[in-house]
Amino acid sequence: MAKRIKKTEEITKKFGDERKKALDDALKNIEKDFGKGAVMRLGERAEQKVQVMSSGSLALDIALGAGGYPKGRIVEIYGPESSGKTTVALHAVAQAQKDGGIAAFIDAEHALDPAYAAALGVNIDELLLSQPDSGEQGLEIAGKLIDSGAVDLVVVDSVAALVPRAEIDGDIGDSHVGLQARMMSQAMRKLSASINKTKTIAIFINQLREKVGIMFGNPETTPGGRALKFYSSVRLDVRGNTQIKGTGEQKDSNIGKETKIKVVKNKVAPPFKEAFVEIIYGEGISRTGELVKIASDLGIIQKAGAWYSYNGEKIGQGSENAKKFLADNPEIFDDIDHKVRVQYGLIEEDNTEEKQSSKEKETDEKADKNLVLELDDTIELED
């Protein structure tokens, strides 16, 4: 019986060695034909955690779960007209430039306002802009920029405005069934691998349409077919909510609107989270406003009555004064922002100072102990 078991083990080992050798040979051949890294074990990848770039909004970074837009992925931002889609995308452009990256904007709608973009923090002198004549041209330009590996962010505004060449050359009234959907499907197949390889973030802004004859369920849909929905790692639904009234001399005027951004699809974190941001007309997302609200909810900024305090010092009476204080003191703004991100687990806590202080404390304790021992020895000698 023992001999039979031993024989079986030998056969199994021999068979296993043969399979391993066959796999090694196959991997060598694949590497020879297609280059190093064509096939690898998942654990061998240097970067296992998804890299992200901040969206430019703290509330949206928290809703996204990972701390921002994932690099090397496709993002779709859609919603009704004038809901703030382009504003959200321009904040991402400003953040990419702030991080030292290069951003490109494919303006298929031919409606980008340079003055508004600059007000949101975009360096318009460094922004690459293209206003293509057709959908194919716009997607080809986006593809070449992505393939270069030198661009960190590409924004396409919008998918609905990417008109196929055949439709432009034809007459108004001609039927072009599924033409745009086929164009987008082909583009997604070509771009997705390049986007992932170059770690470029591709943001596609999209409009809303309504399906005809829908009696039950949601009649809303987005143009361009289903390909973009499938290839997107993140999809954001942007909707304007209530108007924001001004204060003081502007108390009778609407100075902005509260906007809800819902993460309807997320492949890198749990989906269906919502972010509520204040979009101020002419200024964009109020970063100080969202920080005051979130930090107050977490207790990082203390609120007593109408007064807001941080680290025991009052920073303003009323939210507007607190916002103004943070806008005038960027160092304190960054400090509070860092603490909020640490508390939500978006970034790792920097324990360098804590480790250093604990080390100094330990050194002091050792010095005190040595001093006590020396005093004891001195007393014994005197005795």
Swiss-Prot record:
It is found in: Cytoplasm. GO terms for biological process: DNA recombination; DNA repair; SOS response. ATP binds at residues 79-86. Pfam families: RecA, RecA_C. Residues 353-369 have a biased composition (Basic and acidic residues). One of its GO terms (molecular function) is ATP binding. GO terms for cellular component: cytosol. Residues 347-369 are annotated as: Disordered. Keywords: ATP-binding, Cytoplasm, DNA damage, DNA recombination, DNA repair, DNA-binding, Nucleotide-binding, SOS response. The keyword Transferase does not apply. Belongs to the RecA family. Can catalyze the hydrolysis of ATP in the presence of single-stranded DNA, the ATP-dependent uptake of single-stranded DNA by duplex DNA, and the ATP-dependent hybridization of homologous single-stranded DNAs. It interacts with LexA causing its activation and leading to its autocatalytic cleavage. This is Protein RecA.
